[in-house]
From Swiss-Prot:
The gene is pyrC. Belongs to the metallo-dependent hydrolases superfamily. DHOase family. Class II DHOase subfamily. It comes from Cupriavidus pinatubonensis (strain JMP 134 / LMG 1197). The modification N6-carboxylysine is found at residue 100. Its EC number is 3.5.2.3. The active site is at residue 248. It comes from the Bacteria. This is Dihydroorotase. Catalyzes the reversible cyclization of carbamoyl aspartate to dihydroorotate. GO terms for biological process: 'de novo' pyrimidine nucleobase biosynthetic process; 'de novo' UMP biosynthetic process. HAMAP family: PyrC_classII. NCBIfam families: pyrC_dimer. Binds 2 Zn(2+) ions per subunit.
Length: 344
């Protein structure tokens, strides 16, 4: 049984850092484990221009504690009106590494998102031309579609036509949650990848309801059936370079999670690599963790691998019940429980 595993320093290819006091509270958790992260642009207001991305990047770097090394990889928020010129400027900036597609109303702060992908043809053509990846929240939001079917329907309605019309566009299918999505990414032609979260590797939808409502397991896309979880584990541990680590760590104050209309999102930045190690260990695939966490993402984005390392040791430790979060507190996934791996 492996007791210690040292890997190339990993990256997080899907992260929410928020802003202001919340940013300052959560950034050190990510920087302790990851060399870089793709930063989601769904602030209020959203980050829709290169100028806004540059300012947000500066705020992130200003919040980074002294002695910590971390590179934020910025993204723009795609809207129905994103001009092609902004895409060209984003690519030229050197610090914007993708453009995020949120279907309007799909998740937190997505109200300004895309209402019809056909309205974005100019921006998408520019992205394909300059080589800027499209990062897709892959769910439809129609009221008549069951929430557990949103991802599968998105593949048929949006992803398939998108890939047909822009076959050379680099696309990341973010935080996939279904066997359908895993199979789609595995079999797709052209430059397609996918991020997978630790919580979707470890849990199925029963976790939300065991013994009562468990709001800290509620995220979007929502956890799915066990058959889908098993398919995600198989994809992540397959050795395919199309699948890579993206925590989708999404902090919300405790009072906004434990609420009559609670926010979606799981906070995992504090213990992300420990959770991934648990998932890969359970699958008997610790030897596949380094590629998933440290190699596949940089290869897809055309970036060098990190030069440092991170060590995971088999060691029991108790996760805090809550964490400081500005004037509030934040409850991490599995709060107060014992974890079996420790990152150093």
């Amino acid at each position: 049984m492996t007791q210690k595993l040292t890997i190339t320093r990993p990256d997080d290819w899907h992260l929410h850092l928020r802003d202001g006091a919340a940013l300052a509270a959560v950034l050190p958790d990510t920087a302790r484990q990851f060399g870089r992260a793709i930063i989601m642009p769904n602030l209020k207001p959203p980050v829709t221009t290169v100028e806004q991305a540059q300012a947000y990047r500066a705020r992130i770097l200003a919040a980074l504690p002294a002695g910590m090394s971390f590179e934020p990889l910025m993204t723009l928020y795609l809207t129905d009106n994103t001009p092609a010129e902004e895409i060209v400027a984003a690519k030229a900036s050197g610090f914007v590494h993708g453009v995020k597609l949120y279907p309007a109303g799909a998740t937190t702060n997505s109200d300004a998102g895309v209402t019809d992908i056909r309205r974005c043809a100019g921006a998408l053509e520019a992205m394909q031309r300059v080589g800027l990846p499209l990062l897709v929240h892959g769910e439809v939001t129609d009221g008549d579609i069951d929430i557990f079917d949103r991802e599968a329907v998105f593949i048929d309605r949006v992803m398939t036509p998108l890939r047909r019309d822009f076959p050379e566009l680099k696309v990341v299918f973010e935080h996939i949650t279904t066997r359908d999505a895993a199979q789609y990414v595995r079999d797709a032609s052209g430059p397609v990848g996918a991020t997978i979260t630790a919580h979707h590797l470890l849990y199925n939808r029963n976790a939300i309801f065991t013994g009562g409502i468990r709001p800290h397991y509620y995220c979007l896309p929502v956890l799915k059936r066990e058959t889908h979880r098993e398919a995600l584990v198989a994809a992540a541990t397959s050795g395919s370079d199309r699948f890579f680590l993206g925590t989708d760590s999404a902090p919300h104050a405790r009072g906004l999670k434990e609420h009559a209309c609670g926010c979606a999102g799981c906070y995992t930045a504090l213990h992300a690599m420990e959770l991934y190690a648990e998932a890969f260990d359970a699958a008997g695939a610790l030897d596949k963790l380094e590629a998933f966490a440290s190699f596949n993402g940089p290869a897809f984005y055309g970036l060098p691998r990190n030069t440092g390392t991170l060590t995971l040791e088999r060691e029991d430790w108790q996760l805090p019940a809550e964490l400081p979060y500005g004037d509030a507190t934040l409850v991490p996934l599995r709060a107060g429980e014992t974890l079996r791996w420790k990152a150093r």
